[in-house]
């Protein structure tokens, strides 16, 4: 079985700076694998047998040049890495991202596609579903467990009140939640071995992808202004204290 696990590179949250204008400055933010996609990579590694092949795939802009992140991906189980880099994919919305991934996936060849439920930055939860639609494949999201029985997969979806169990044949698309596993920390041997694994770097023209006419435009991302706290503490439940609390709430709402 050939498994492709798709991932997104996102900025390191602790390095993002909020400017006085409430915009976000990413200048000093290093790239990292989106946390939800670490679960997808781990799920692929746990599912694969010795005879299977795992390929990791991502599309994007300048963040893909980060050699540290490339090694991190390959140290987590994939046998090869595919990168599609184009300036137009730097801030692509889900539909364009999905079209680029689908084109690359068809060129690579696959049996099973595994995505994280959403990305660690926007968490739109759309890309995996859109790729399945573009490729006309069955798609299951909210996947919390995967078992393998030959070429049949037994999938669990943990819902609000129950757990669905679904049998599925490949080819298919799975979007896994963070509950499916705890991603392992790569061993030193795996990190050293990652440098010997193949990295395939493509441009948009290599997969016949071009940006579509936008149905929506990402104008910007802003942080909501923080409300100054009043620092009023009421530490008892006497009638007087309750009346005081009510008075403070009235003032805050008016």
From Swiss-Prot:
Matching SMART domains, A to Z? ETF
Keywords, in A-Z order: Electron transport, FAD, Flavoprotein, Transport
User: Would you kindly state one Gene Ontology biological process term found in this protein's UniProt entry?
Assistant: DNA damage response
SUPFAM superfamilies linked to this entry: Adenine nucleotide alpha hydrolases-like
Keyword Transport listed: yes
Molecular-function GO term, any one: electron transfer activity
- NCBIfam families to which the protein is assigned, alphabetical: PRK03359.1, PRK12342.1
User: Main role?
Assistant: May play a role in a redox process.
Family note: Belongs to the ETF beta-subunit/FixA family.
Subunit relationships: YdiR and YdiQ form a heterodimer.
Q: What is this protein called?
A: Putative electron transfer flavoprotein subunit YdiQ
């Amino acid at each position: 079985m050939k498994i492709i696990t798709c991932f997104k590179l996102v900025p390191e949250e602790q390095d993002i700076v909020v400017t006085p204008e409430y915009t976000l400055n990413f200048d000093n933010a290093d790239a990292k694998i989106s946390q939800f996609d670490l679960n997808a990579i781990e799920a692929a590694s746990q599912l694969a047998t010795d005879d299977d092949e795992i390929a990791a795939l991502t599309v994007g802009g300048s963040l893909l040049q980060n050699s540290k992140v490339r090694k991190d991906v390959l140290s987590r189980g994939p046998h090869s890495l595919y990168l599609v880099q184009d300036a137009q994919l730097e801030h692509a919305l889900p539909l364009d991202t999905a079209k680029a991934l689908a084109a690359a996936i068809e060129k690579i060849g696959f049996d099973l596609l595994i995505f994280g439920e959403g990305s660690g930055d926007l968490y739109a939860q759309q890309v995996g579903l859109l790729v399945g639609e573009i490729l006309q494949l069955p798609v299951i999201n909210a996947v919390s467990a995967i078992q393998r029985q030959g070429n049949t997969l037994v999938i669990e979806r943990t819902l609000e009140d129950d757990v669905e169990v679904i049998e599925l044949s490949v080819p298919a698309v799975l979007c896994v939640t963070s509950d499916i596993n705890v991603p392992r920390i790569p061993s030193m041997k795996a990190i050293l071995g990652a440098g010997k694994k193949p990295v395939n770097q493509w441009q948009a023209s290599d997969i016949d992808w071009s940006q579509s006419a936008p149905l929506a435009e990402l104008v910007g991302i802003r942080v909501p202004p923080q409300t100054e706290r009043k620092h009023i503490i009421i530490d008892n439940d006497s009638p007087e204290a309750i009346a005081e609390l009510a008075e403070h709430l009235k003032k805050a709402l008016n």
